[in-house]
């Protein structure tokens, strides 16, 4: 599942680009609502104005990916929390504290949220806050398509056009696709529609032209769009168009709110949209400034961002990660050793699971003790699936650092507990759990052994990139090969980095200060 909704995507995307964004909405008192709020907050978005509606559920949409042009959508938005936003929910001081207010077109489609939007616009005008409209026309959300037909992007309707036209004078910036300006202008001809919009609003108009890019119109509508500047799009292979418009808007705002030129605003917007359509997700696919800088500085066009290793790595490391304090981690992912102890004591190995649940209580006590002593620290654990599944379940969702092993204990060459297809096992893992893999590795291993080990590690790293889980590599030089331990460790890490393997965490033996240097 991904965070979604046009407004939420834009709040997420602008925050990722370094803007101070905030979301004003409602969510249900449910798991999905909490997921949305947590996702926005983790990205740096202000969520203080998001209210919890105990009477309604959080809206959802199901997305299908058939081919490069077919993306069926089913919206579940009847009587949902965000569409119950009321005028009383709009705080004048909150609006006044903003530099810009963005509203998407769907928020004018029903009476209640329409009044709430007008209230927000009134406050924005009163306090000199820039007002932005993303037309974001979805016929199904205006009752013009079948309930399951979320894919249809345009249905002409005179009443909808009149309704949209009534709010156009209130905005300073209006952004939409060609089809969205057709509905706003109430015409089947784009230039005629744009002239109607211009007769109602002096706003800057940004027309999205799909793969061709976009154009910006400040004053009179030209005889042809080509008579103005067409800012070209980024050529990429399309995987999923959903979220592209929200990424475009995020990029455009990141320039527009800093008074950048039209060319720069459109460069940012087109690049953000291009990167998102080349990836599977919507909000999580939104780029960072570091990704955009790399894209713009590339000497050759990057048409497959999803396959560019540098861009993939930047997308991993330049997005916000949880800021851990000093960590106190209890490692009890031992399997074979505990089985041996159980057998030596004449005990049934199945009791190991109960033992590991006791270890959870130990972690809880340490966490409580650290709080009582005022120590700024986080706690965590390493636990295995074989004997520690109940412990993993108990630890998940508590804000703890949680990692679990995937390697067959003692294997050399490296083998995984659930076979070579480690990625198929990761599907069932909670996103917060970290992949831990211990490898007995030496850069001077016999070539066939070293290559097999490196292939396994690379496959695991690639699987972690797809699944979104962080990877922890524990490198232990085998005892049967010579060499000073610090030097071997240094060469091992350097070799893996050179192979393009960048785990989020390393687990290595402590070194002296001199050895670290």
Q: Predicted segment positions?
A:
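Alpha-helix C-terminal capping segments
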Residues: 9-20, 63-65, 255-258
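Conserved, mostly hydrophobic/aromatic
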Residues: 330, 474, 506
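Alpha/beta catalytic barrel-like cores
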Residues: 302-445
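Alpha/beta enzyme core
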Residues: 361, 368, 420-434, 442-443, ...
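Conserved beta-alpha-beta core of the PfkB/ribokinase-like small-molecule kinase fold
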Residues: 100-196, 203, 211-220, 475, ...
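Conserved N-terminal subdomain of the carbohydrate kinase-like
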Residues: 20-105, 293-302
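Conserved phosphate-binding/catalytic region of the ribokinase-like
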Residues: 122-126, 159, 186-309
